[in-house]
């Protein structure tokens, strides 16, 4: 079995994330794409949307797609989970012959700082979602995406133009409510 893991905060999920999901399904030779929202990203202190809400948005957007599985492993841990731990969990579950780990190009600069990076690098092939034409090292796969949007922009401005139609109204109401509190 060939699998790919796309983890993230998804706070909120947006068209950039959607582009990564659709490109991965189209361009990678995989049997399963596992989308795994984080409980708390090891590199962030907090989220705006709680883990249950982010999981529901992700499930609503991509849970119906063929080959896609929405996984709550990291959320169930109720703590920051390093990627290596999620990868080992999925290895035990699926024993894949090929394992792709999808990450944004913005993570490249600090990738070597990730927990147990050497072991992680030996277990997966990194696929870089490249939205800014950043030079991707030759030992990584380049997954071109055409969306240049950040979740923080959506949260800060309440501009939901780049939020997927299926959840646009929910996202706007959710963050408006947070801003009022």
From Swiss-Prot:
Domain of life where this protein originates: Bacteria
Swiss-Prot/TrEMBL GO biological process terms: NAD biosynthetic process
Keywords: ATP-binding, NAD, Nucleotide-binding, Nucleotidyltransferase, Pyridine nucleotide biosynthesis, Transferase
Catalytic activity: nicotinate beta-D-ribonucleotide + ATP + H(+) = deamido-NAD(+) + diphosphate
Record-listed E.C. numbers: 2.7.7.18
SUPFAM superfamilies, sorted: Nucleotidylyl transferase
InterPro entries recorded: Cyt_trans-like, NadD/NMNAT, Rossmann-like_a/b/a_fold
Pathway given in the UniProt record: Cofactor biosynthesis; NAD(+) biosynthesis; deamido-NAD(+) from nicotinate D-ribonucleotide: step 1/1
Top class in the EC scheme: transferase
Record Pfam families: CTP_transf_like
Function: Catalyzes the reversible adenylation of nicotinate mononucleotide (NaMN) to nicotinic acid adenine dinucleotide (NaAD).
Family the entry assigns: Belongs to the NadD family.
PANTHER family tied to this protein: NICOTINATE-NUCLEOTIDE ADENYLYLTRANSFERASE-RELATED (PTHR39321), PHOSPHOPANTETHEINE ADENYLYLTRANSFERASE (PTHR39321:SF3)
Protein name stated in the entry: Probable nicotinate-nucleotide adenylyltransferase
Organism this protein belongs to: Campylobacter jejuni subsp. jejuni serotype O:23/36 (strain 81-176)
């Amino acid at each position: 079995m060939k699998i790919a893991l796309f983890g993230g905060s998804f706070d909120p999920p947006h068209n950039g994330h959607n582009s990564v999901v659709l490109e991965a399904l189209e361009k990678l030779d995989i049997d399963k794409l596992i989308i795994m929202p984080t409980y708390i990203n090891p590199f962030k202190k907090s989220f705006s949307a709680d883990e249950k809400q982010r999981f529901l948005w992700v499930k609503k957007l991509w849970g119906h797609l063929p080959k896609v599985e929405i996984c709550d492993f990291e959320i169930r841990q109720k703590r920051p989970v390093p990627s290596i731990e999620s990868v080992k969990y999925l290895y035990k579950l699926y024993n894949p012959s090929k394992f792709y780990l999808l990450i944004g190009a913005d993570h490249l600069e600090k990738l070597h700082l990730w927990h147990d990076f050497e072991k992680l690098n030996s277990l997966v092939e990194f696929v870089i979602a490249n939205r800014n034409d950043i030079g991707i090292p030759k030992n990584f796969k380049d997954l071109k995406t055409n969306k240049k949007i950040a979740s923080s922009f959506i949260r800060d401005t309440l501009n939901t133009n780049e939020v997927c139609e299926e959840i646009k109204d929910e996202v706007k109401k959710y963050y408006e409510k947070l801003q009022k509190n």
